[in-house]
A protein has these predicted regions:
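Basic/aromatic recognition patch in beta-strand/loop cores that engages polyanionic ligands
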Residues: 48-79
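Enriched for short, Lys/Arg-rich terminal
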Residues: 68, 73-98
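Short, hydrophobic secondary-structure boundary micro-motifs
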Residues: 29, 51-53, 94
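Arg/Lys-rich, positively charged N-terminal/basic patches that mediate binding to nucleic acids
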Residues: 1-33
Length: 98
């Protein structure tokens, strides 16, 4: 199944990579980036495996990768849309629609 990254999700993953690079290493940043991308590809093929988070936004699902949560929904044309990738300590309900 196909997936689409929102502009915010693209920015999120770039910020995650940069933060990891600046605080750990290039190798760790690349490893974490690839881990997140692997999970996105898994979600695209197994959308129902994500936990329903209707309490945040109706129709959204979430999947955890280490310290981050990937939020997604399925579009009308059956494409999985990755909405945001947020750190677990963030205020999800307010940050999801920023």
């Amino acid at each position: 199944m196909r997936y689409l990254l929102s502009e915010k999700a693209k920015q999120d993953i770039e910020k995650i990579w940069l933060y990891t690079y600046e605080n750990w290493s290039l190798e760790q940043a690349d490893r974490y980036y690839n881990l997140i991308l692997d999970e996105i590809e898994f979600i695209a093929e197994n959308f129902e495996s994500g936990k329903s988070v209707d309490y945040i936004k109706k129709g959204y699902r979430a999947s955890i990768v280490k310290s981050h949560i990937i939020f997604c929904k399925k579009s009308r044309n059956n494409i999985v849309e990755i909405i945001r990738i947020l750190h677990q300590k963030m205020d999800m309900e307010n940050r999801i629609d920023e």
